[in-house]
Amino acid sequence: TNYVFLKFDKEIYLSSNSAASIFVHCPIEIGIFLINGSDRESLDWITCDSLNSRFGLYGSPDTGTLCKYAEVTLATDMTDSIPYVEGVMKIILENNLDSGQTVSKVIFPITDNSLYYENSKVILDGLRVTLRKRAVVSIADVKSESVDTDWTKSPTWEDTTASTSMEMGLE
């Protein structure tokens, strides 16, 4: 699956029409590819934290999205990665609704986020999560945001997803 379900260790409360920026630890994986000229085929993905590797289902059992699931802690800044296990991702949370909201998770396609490394440290492209109304339903638009860094960018050979939204079962 290309989707990641990050469950925060602390709930983030956003009052109406407010925003917050947080840093979270995000699990990393190593991809093994077969490369023949311009043809690239992924053979396997190996998680760097095999003891905590889980999958979760976002949505109903019959139509939900299978996700790589991780319970993540808040990081202090972009350099707070756990060497060879977890990188750091910046998430900007915007609440454009007329009421306060609590955010405890985010689901997104990881193929939209590049990974950068320097020695044993890792950072990932960030996310912008916008809580808003679409007709009568509250949704969370999730978009990838490139990080500005001089760290080495890891090669990317997977397809990307244009945009995503999740219904507000935000809890």
Stretch-by-stretch model annotation:
Residues 1-171:
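Interface-prone segments of viral and bacterial extracellular assemblies
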